């Protein structure tokens, strides 16, 4: 898998797209990622986001999880987090997450690598079509979902899924889910997929 374009957007964020037929707007994705990091109290953590095709994510899913099938998002955490706990009726995710991440960050002398998120744009497009959403919104949702997995959230057990969905909804609201101009507008566009001649 050779990167089509890679951009170390900041010292803490790297965005790579390995597909010719899609162009990701690294400025918009950087803003999305910075808002997610702020929402979850992860300002001191580095993260990498890679956008791939169906074949690449299927290979990774088989290699690392034992599932020989295409999926939409994979997360590769580099930190073992304490298990997330349910929030009170009036959640303040940012405050709770900041305390949680500060405990881990306080032990480090250099910025910590939170992990890597790999997203299949073709699978995200299928998901978006199936649920009547835009590709842009679905990609943003998958970045949030991937971040939560990096932070130890999961959705296997019903109570864990309920907690993860609650946090996911709040972060999506912080990204403009309920506004007319969500942050993810124009974060990706389809291209012809052909190489430009010199």
Stretches with model-predicted labels:
Residues 1-140, 150-198:
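An acidic/histidine-cluster motif and surrounding catalytic segment
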């Amino acid at each position: 898998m050779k990167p089509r374009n890679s951009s170390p957007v900041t010292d803490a964020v790297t965005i790579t797209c390995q597909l010719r037929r899609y162009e990701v707007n690294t400025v918009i994705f950087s803003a999305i990622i910075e808002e997610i990091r702020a929402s979850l109290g992860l300002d001191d953590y580095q993260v990498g986001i890679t956008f791939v095709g169906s074949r690449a994510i299927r290979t990774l899913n088989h290699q690392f999880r034992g599932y020989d099938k295409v999926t939409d998002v994979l997360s590769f955490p580099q930190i073992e987090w304490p298990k997330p706990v349910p929030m009170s009726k009036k959640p303040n995710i940012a405050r709770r997450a900041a305390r949680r991440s500060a405990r881990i960050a306080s032990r480090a002398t250099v910025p910590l690598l939170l992990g890597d998120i790999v997203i299949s744009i073709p699978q995200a497009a299928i998901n978006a079509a199936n649920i009547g959403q835009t590709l842009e919104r679905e990609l943003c949702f998958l970045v949030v979902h991937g971040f939560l997995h990096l932070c130890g959230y999961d959705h296997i057990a019903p109570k864990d899924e309920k907690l993860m969905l609650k946090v996911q909804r709040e972060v999506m609201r912080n990204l403009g889910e309920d506004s007319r101009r969500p942050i993810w507008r124009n974060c990706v566009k389809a291209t012809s997929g052909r190489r430009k001649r010199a």
